[in-house]
Amino acid sequence: MNECVTVTGTIVDDTNGRNSDGVRHEADGDTHGWLRPDPQFANLLDNGNRTAENGDLVFEIVCHYRVTQADAKPSCSAFGDHTVIPPVGSHVAITGTFVQDTNHQRWNEIHPVSKILVVP
């Protein structure tokens, strides 16, 4: 874990349509989006992804949205992300740091995301 990876897959909406862009807008300014990885990356999913994240890989872009969480405001005060998140259904390559989120149900994620590219 904690290595830079590039994963291909399809952006999916696990918000059940609550957000038009298909990603959750976190209070700390981060995105919480979901990638259905291509078969060759299925090994990146763990039990937390399967049980808590609908079998998808989470991706988080830091400081992407307005920050409302007080302790996160200093971190994003001098930085604002301008990554374009492709629409749900887009086949993409996401590059970033591969980690396990141990604060929740121990799912794997790409956090932070460095780059998202639409690919064929």
Regions found by a protein language model. Name each.
Residues 1-3:
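Short boundary/loop segments of OB/S1/cold-shock single-stranded nucleic-acid-binding domains
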Residues 5-6, 11-120:
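OB-fold single-stranded nucleic acid-binding module
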